[in-house]
């Protein structure tokens, strides 16, 4: 048996954005938005595996400000692209992911947290040489902290997590890649590609940092993974195949549960267009 439940809510979201070229190749962007985020199906109902749903979640509402600078220019066969952004978010009813034990098993759970303020930045850099080679990467730092000063239901007692970093989510991470293409190899219209990409993620806490002994706290450790892919296409991409090795150094990688992911893995693909 089941019970039909329904909920109705309505909110007005809006935004405004502007852009200006400071010089020919240097562009500035500024935007503001009043945003609402509805809970996802996994957040509401779980995934029947490691996520436990919560049907009474409220939508997030936030005031977001973004400022971006980008510069891109070609110098003959050489291309350069730089981009930097800063963000500010003031979020109410923040949907926070945590961990809970249900029936002796640990599950991911979601709950609304009164208020969270987020400040962050990202920097991207990319260089390319003609059609042959490109290399680049992105660095991100997202500082989301509890801004709910007093405990829920108590207007006098200050929350021990006030001002603390939101747990169980990465806050410093980067990705980088390099790609080489050899056009018209063996025959016109055929291309050999060799690609590398990597990902770095700084350690982060599973629970509030203010709670418990700092020397015994559960943390998801630093992670650094490397992937390689070799591909060859024929007749301008009509036929193509690729071989890929993911995590080729066989590093220990973890998800937000601190559960270990699969190690070194190999994949092959063949396509006909």
Language model features with spans:
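Signature of Gram-negative outer-membrane beta-barrel scaffolds
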Residues: 1-23, 38, 143
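Outer-membrane beta-barrel translocator domains and adjoining extracellular loop/strand segments
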Residues: 1-2, 41-48, 94-102, 142, ...
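Residue-level signature of outer-membrane beta-barrel architecture
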Residues: 10, 18-21, 34, 59, ...
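Hydrophobic, lipid-facing positions within transmembrane beta-strands of outer-membrane proteins
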Residues: 12-16, 28, 53, 63-67, ...
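Membrane-embedded beta-barrel scaffold of Gram-negative outer-membrane proteins
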Residues: 21, 27-31, 59-119, 140, ...
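C-terminal beta-signal and adjacent terminal beta-strands/loops
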Residues: 36, 92, 199-212, 216-225, ...
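Gram-negative outer-membrane beta-barrel transporters
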Residues: 79-90, 111-205, 249, 271
């Amino acid at each position: 048996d089941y019970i039909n439940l329904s909920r109705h809510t309505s909110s007005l979201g809006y935004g405004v954005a502007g852009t200006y070229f400071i010089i020919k190749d240097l562009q500035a962007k500024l935007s503001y938005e009043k945003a609402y985020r509805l809970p996802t199906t996994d957040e509401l109902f779980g995934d029947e595996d490691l996520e436990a749903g919560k049907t009474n979640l409220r939508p997030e509402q936030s005031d977001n400000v973004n400022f971006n600078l980008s510069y891109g220019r070609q110098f003959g066969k050489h291309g350069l692209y730089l981009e930097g952004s800063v963000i500010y978010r003031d979020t109410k009813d923040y949907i926070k992911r945590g961990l809970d034990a249900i029936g002796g098993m640990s599950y991911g759970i979601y709950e609304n947290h009164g208020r969270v303020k987020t400040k962050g930045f990202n920097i991207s850099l990319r260089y390319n040489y003609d059609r042959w080679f490109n290399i680049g990467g992105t660095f991100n730092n997202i500082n989301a902290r509890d801004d709910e000063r007093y405990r829920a239901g108590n207007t006098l007692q200050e929350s021990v997590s006030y001002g603390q970093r939101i747990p169980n989510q990465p806050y410093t991470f980067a990705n980088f890649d390099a790609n080489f293409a050899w056009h018209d190899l063996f025959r016109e219209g055929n291309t050999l590609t060799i690609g590398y990409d990597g990902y770095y993620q700084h350690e982060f806490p599973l629970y509030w940092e203010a709670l418990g002994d700092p020397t015994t706290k559960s943390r998801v450790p630093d992670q650094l993974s490397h992937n390689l892919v070799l591909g060859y296409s024929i007749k301008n991409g009509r036929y193509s195949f690729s071989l890929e090795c993911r995590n080729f150094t066989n590093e220990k990688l973890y998800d937000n549960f601190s559960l270990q992911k699969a190690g070194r893995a190999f994949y092959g693909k063949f396509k006909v267009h």
